[in-house]
Amino acid sequence: MSTTLLDPEARIAKLLDSANYELLLPRTDCGMVAATGLIKGNKVVVFASDPTIKGGALGIEGSQVIVQAYRAAMGAQVPVIGIWHSGGARLSDGVASLNAFGEVFQAMVTASGRIPQISLVLGPTAGGGAYGP
């Protein structure tokens, strides 16, 4: 499979109107990207894991990207969409990565019943990534 097809920004661009989006945070090597954009003219917040970086495993920094995406969606009262292709927790971050997943789950629970939460699973998704909405 082409790495272009796995790129989280490419996946976000395919989902949104006219591939027009704005990153919430500067892109790093954390394995997670978040952006705002429009789908059929409606504002959404989207986050996507990057399976080309450590198999999409989610660490501390990547978890914070998701939490920020949820905060942005809650603040704007718009849907949040997660694009998952993740190997679960980034074990190289140690026990702290498990705590970071807890922060993601807390953001999901806080948003429950308040904004729409949509998950797209586009590849293998293990551990915490499999427990999203």
Tell me what each language-model feature is.
Residues 1-118, 124, 129-130:
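Terminal-region recognition feature
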